[in-house]
């Protein structure tokens, strides 16, 4: 299953993902709603570490971890386990939104400092 075809994520996913992003580059391997592995194609430690960081700041997330299976493999595996009141897909979407908000804040702060 891909992120685009995931039933719980489709509507909320489309609200913030830029049109240029290929949602088919994320494959979902789900054991249960609260526990899933997401396989990102063409992503590396940059996104993996950032997602892991923001996910672990979320009190509804019990576990987050990522791995790059092999340096020559262009995949990043992200495992998320949540508490029962939120799904792994919802926490991933929240994490991506948090990264977007943090990036926007850094960009605006940097530009404001340049203007002074």
Swiss-Prot record:
GO molecular function, one term: DNA-directed RNA polymerase activity
Places the protein is found: Nucleus
Chain's role: DNA-dependent RNA polymerase catalyzes the transcription of DNA into RNA using the four ribonucleoside triphosphates as substrates. Common core component of RNA polymerases I and III which synthesize ribosomal RNA precursors and small RNAs, such as 5S rRNA and tRNAs, respectively.
Alphabetical keyword list: DNA-directed RNA polymerase, Nucleus, Transcription
Stored InterPro entries: RBP11-like, RBP11-like_dimer, RNA_pol_Rpb11_13-16kDa_CS, RNAP_AC19, Rpo11-like
Highest taxon above the source species: Eukaryota
Protein name: DNA-directed RNA polymerases I and III subunit rpc19
Annotated gene: rpc19
Assembly description: Component of the RNA polymerase I (Pol I) and RNA polymerase III (Pol III) complexes consisting of 14 and 17 subunits, respectively.
SUPFAM superfamilies: RBP11-like subunits of RNA polymerase
Lineage of source species: Eukaryota, Amoebozoa, Evosea, Eumycetozoa, Dictyostelia
Predominant localisation class: nucleus
PANTHER family: DNA-DIRECTED RNA POLYMERASE I,II,III, DNA-DIRECTED RNA POLYMERASES I AND III SUBUNIT RPAC2
Biological processes per GO annotation: transcription by RNA polymerase I; transcription by RNA polymerase III; transcription elongation by RNA polymerase I
Similarity-based family: Belongs to the archaeal Rpo11/eukaryotic RPB11/RPC19 RNA polymerase subunit family.
One GO CC annotation: RNA polymerase I complex
HAMAP family: RNApol_arch_Rpo11
Coiled-coil region list: none
UniProt-listed Pfam families: RNA_pol_L_2
């Amino acid at each position: 299953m891909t992120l685009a075809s995931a039933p719980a994520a489709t509507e909320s996913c489309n609200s913030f993902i830029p049109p240029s992003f290929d949602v088919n580059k994320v494959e979902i391997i789900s054991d249960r709603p609260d526990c899933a592995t997401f396989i990102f194609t063409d992503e590396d430690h940059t996104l993996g570490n950032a997602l892991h960081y923001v996910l672990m700041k979320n009190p509804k997330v019990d576990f987050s971890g990522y791995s790059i299976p092999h340096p020559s493999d262009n995949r990043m595996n992200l495992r998320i386990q949540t508490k029962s009141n939120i799904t792994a897909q919802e926490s991933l979407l929240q994490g991506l939104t948090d990264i977007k908000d943090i990036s926007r804040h850094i960009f605006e702060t940097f530009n404001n400092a340049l203007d002074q």
